[in-house]
A protein has these predicted regions:
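Residue-level recognition of conserved beta-strand edge/terminus positions
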Residues: 136-137, 382
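Extended, small/polar residue-biased N-terminal targeting/export presequences
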Residues: 53-114, 158-190, 523-533, 541-548
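Conserved functional hotspot residues or short segments at active or partner-binding sites
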Residues: 350-351, 355-548
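Structural motif
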Residues: 130-132
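Polar, glycine-rich mid-to-C-terminal structural blocks
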Residues: 297, 309, 316, 320-377, ...
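Cleft-lining beta-strand/loop regions that shape enzyme active-site pockets
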Residues: 28-38, 42-59, 82, 112-115, ...
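Short linear motifs in exposed loops
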Residues: 115, 144, 177, 339, ...
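Bacterial Sec-dependent N-terminal signal peptides
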Residues: 1-33
């Protein structure tokens, strides 16, 4: 009996010990068990569907839908890239793709060339903005989406694409055989001088070797135009490769300067990036323009130069993308672009605006933390970069907006270019009074109409007033407002002539001088650039901002 009792006691103690041990063993294995369990469930569902579902299954579509739905629970930057989208991955990282070099759009159910890139196959073959692509390699495009048409235009460099084209104003279609090339989107959209000593570089994306393009532009501005101050325009620059941002920063800050730190879940994701070369322009005054679309590598560059009190940041608060992605190879030539780390500026700031693990709302300003720049200025984390000088957009939704969005301006520019072989240079081109009147007549002949946004809100207000029972007492006032808010097209074409002319001249200039010409023209009316010029010209103001 004693022996049995001891055995029972030992067994009982062993059970207790094992039970106490289980939580500690399982704690490290729980997540792997959950992964295995859910994989089993997913595979079981697929098996049951394959065996029992009444119709055949679209396996590829089902799998991609399941993966994409899963990734939507994380953040918008973690994405699955199937083999069919491999070209998009190449474009994302290098800025290169195989194609004809043209931007296309859908207009009235047709695929139209919005803009051929200068010097690219489309432009060299004689294709023009406004040309309608009727067929690509015998496939009719009527009703096709832009992505469908784009996939047919892209392909292996050196291969031919046969196009059937309809040109506005001409009755017959014609054919073009265009040889695809490796198309490289130029990261520097424009560079030039804004005054005798101030350079300007508009930088659109941080793709592979884009820092070299920046260096070449800056070198030319210094050697040929003798600039000694620089405005870097990062507006609408959504970022790209971190290394390119570091290489640009290294031109202006001391060797071994910390630019950005990455911190992730695994050790391999933790990295510190410092400059490795002596700066070429350590004393050049810098001003960086940013807006709400400046993100990622743009914020790394602007944030580092702000933290080191090396550049004045001007514009609007940036996007707030403080997450870094790596591309991981998957089976069957597919890829996963996955968020692996958060980045931190030299002062220790993480600029991520939205917490995707929580309620997916932007971090309110009162919950952000303070950090100090090199010379003691206060900056904050969470929510992007707050500029040293904030600018506001001159937001207008008048008739010019509707003329643009309804492609009236685009169509008139097509007609204008067909009847004018040449125009003046971008910095001198102007529409005459007679030419503007011709545009007015064109708009009237097109039976153009539009409804003011304020009128739409007024109708909503009228409905709410009726629901609340105040219709009788407010009806006459609302009717007066309705009459006042009816667009008078003839009057509005004159009242908002300045805004309309700017858009129209810009579109016309692009037909002759392409993107660079358009950028040069638009600088003339860019209020932010004018404000930036005033700041960078004022040495005392620059000093007061950077070293208060």
């Amino acid at each position: 009996m004693k022996i049995d009792g001891l055995r029972r006691l030992k067994t009982k103690n062993l059970v207790i010990i094992l039970l106490l041990s289980v939580p500690f063993v399982c704690f490290g294995q729980t997540k792997y068990f959950e992964i295995s369990q859910n994989s089993d469930i997913y595979n079981a569902v697929l098996r049951e569907l394959e065996l029992n579902y009444v119709d055949s299954l679209p396996h590829k579509k089902m799998t991609e839908t399941a993966i994409n739905s899963m990734l939507k629970l994380l953040d918008p930057y973690t994405v699955f890239i199937p083999k069919s989208d491999k070209n998009a991955l190449t474009m994302m990282t290098t800025g290169m793709y195989g194609g004809i070099g043209a931007i296309i759009m859908q207009k009235d159910g047709e695929i139209v060339i919005a803009e051929p890139h200068e010097g690219m196959p489309a432009q060299r073959s004689g294709l023009k903005a406004g040309d309608i692509l009727v067929q690509i390699n015998g496939v009719k495009l009527k009703g096709k989406s832009v992505s469908e048409a784009s996939s047919k235009l892209r392909g292996i460099p050196g291969t031919e694409v046969r196009l059937k084209v309809k040109r506005p104003g001409e009755k017959k279609t014609f054919e073009k055989v265009v040889v695809r090339e490796a198309i490289k989107i130029e990261p520097v959209s424009y560079y030039g001088t804004l005054s005798d000593s101030i350079g300007y570089i508009s930088f659109r994306e941080f793709t592979a070797k884009s820092a070299n393009s920046f260096k070449n532009a800056l070198s030319e501005l210094i050697q040929q135009h003798h600039i000694n101050k620089l405005i870097i325009d990062l507006r609408d620059n959504g970022g790209g490769l971190v290394n390119e941002a570091i290489e640009i920063a290294s031109l202006f800050v001391p060797k071994r300067s910390l630019i950005v730190s990455l911190k992730g879940k695994i050790k391999e994701a933790n990295k510190v990036y410092k400059t490795v070369s002596e700066p070429l322009y350590p004393e050049m005054p810098l001003l960086i323009l940013v807006n709400e679309e400046s993100a990622s590598a743009s914020e790394i560059l602007a944030g580092a130069l702000q933290d080191m009190d090396r550049a004045v940041i001007v514009g609007k608060r940036t996007f707030g993308k403080g997450l870094v992605q790596n591309v991981r190879m998957l089976p069957h030539e597919s890829y996963l672009k996955v968020t692996t780390a958060k980045y931190y500026t030299p002062s220790g700031r993480c600029l991520q605006a939205i917490n995707y693990t929580g309620d997916r709302k932007k971090t309110p300003d009162n919950l952000t933390s303070e950090f100090k720049t090199l010379h003691g200025r206060t900056v904050r984390d969470g929510g992007g970069i707050t500029p040293d000088t904030t600018l506001t957009d001159d937001e207008k939704i008048n008739i010019s907006y509707y003329l643009f969005t309804k492609n009236i301006i685009f169509d008139y520019a097509t007609q204008y270019a067909a009847s004018h072989p040449t125009i003046a240079t971008p910095d001198t081109f102007r529409l005459s009074d007679e030419e503007y009147q011709q545009f007015v007549d064109y708009v009237i002949d097109r039976d153009f109409t539009y409804q003011l946004e304020s009128n739409k809100y007024l109708q909503d207000l009228r409905k709410m007033i009726r629901i609340e029972g105040y219709e009788a007492s407010t009806d006459s006032i609302l009717n007066q407002l309705t009459d006042l808010l009816k667009p008078d097209i003839q009057k509005d074409l004159q009242l908002f002539r300045k805004d309309i002319t700017f858009m129209l001249e810009s579109e016309i200039v692009k037909r002759y001088y392409f993107q660079k010409g358009e950028a040069e023209y638009r600088l003339r009316g860019d209020k932010w650039v004018k404000d930036a010029l005033k700041i960078i010209k004022d040495r005392d103001k620059m000093t007061a901002i950077l070293r208060p």
